[in-house]
Amino acid sequence: MITIFHQLPHLEAYGNPQYFFYLILAVLPVFIGLFFKRRFPIYEALVSLAFIILMLTGKDLNQIISLLAYVVWQVVLVFAYQLYRKKYDNNWVFYISVFLAILPLAWTKVTPLMTIDNHQSLFGFLGISYLTFRAVGTIMEVRDGVLKEFSLWQFLRFMLFMPTFSSGPIDRFNRFNEDYENIPERDELLDMLEESVHYLMLGFLYKFILAYIFGTLLLIPLKEMALQMGGIFNIATLGVMYTYGLDLFFDFAGYSMFALAISNLMGIKSPVNFNQPFKSRDLKEFWNRWHMSLSFWFRDFVFMRLVKVLVKHKVFKNRNVTSSVAYIINMLIMGFWHGLTWYYIAYGLFHGVGLVINDAWVRKKKKINRDRKKQGLSPLPDNKWTQGLGIFITFNVVMLSFLLFSGFLDQLWFPKPPVK
């Protein structure tokens, strides 16, 4: 059996045309079945499992073994908490359950810091972050009473949904299960098919053409030039800032479109991840358009709960201070989620402080307009020019944050001595 796994080819998720050929061929019977109001649960499970295994195969079987252990761990936690929640509701039991659900991911983040040569954890695997969001979200919704009864099969189907397995979008159990249980009508399925073709074409443009131009043809030489010029900041670093930011968007948005396309073919309308984020007029709007499934998850499961706790215990008298502290903690946690390096943490702090400043400006603007109204004056201008200025400022602030996120400043400011 182990020999068979070693002989399997490795297929990078949405990595090349060969992958798409195999994948579309595999999910085509699922879509045809939906057209005749039928699902093939066992076949769908086998397709998902097969492609997940092919994503995780490689030099060794560590990722496959880790995934198996991880799924068993989360199943035990989720169903133990579901059983407990039917009769009891203790805060500490809930906190411990969430902590234990996050523990495998935290371990994979911490392990490289504990080794001399930054070796990755043996317990990590592709997609562990996104599976953790699903598991933790499920526990929280069980606590809230939103989820009460669900089977092992339903939970595994949700956790191991292949199109969004490796990098999202992040879904919620109820939304996913409702899609699965309610097969769309033929007209809607045809619309979903048309949408899938659109997503695939746009995804190919984004990921394989535009991301290649920005991420390979432009970014690599600009990085080399910036490192040669040195210093705190230089003109080539400015080029790195914009090319990296655009590469990040086109690469990730392209991947997300592929995930949405294949989800549609399997009868699931997964959440949209990007909605023209560079049209945002301020930072709050940006987070309502950028990596939306992640930002909405943090909003619902971290920010709102943190605000509720702070208000309940009257930690701060001023509600604006409460929301400001919650913004910073929320975005810091997001930074830590990306990785335990100074630039990821600084990225989270950057956006937390940015959202605080954004809210402060909105409040200030409202006050100015109220005062102007009392004086019989017109409000501050809000037209295409001011909106355009807001878009310009937001775009550049976001690009600066992406430069921080990229880790390139770590190379520029703290160059490592050459290996002898």
Label every PLM stretch briefly.
Residues 2-420:
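Membrane-embedded transmembrane alpha-helical bundles that form the catalytic cores
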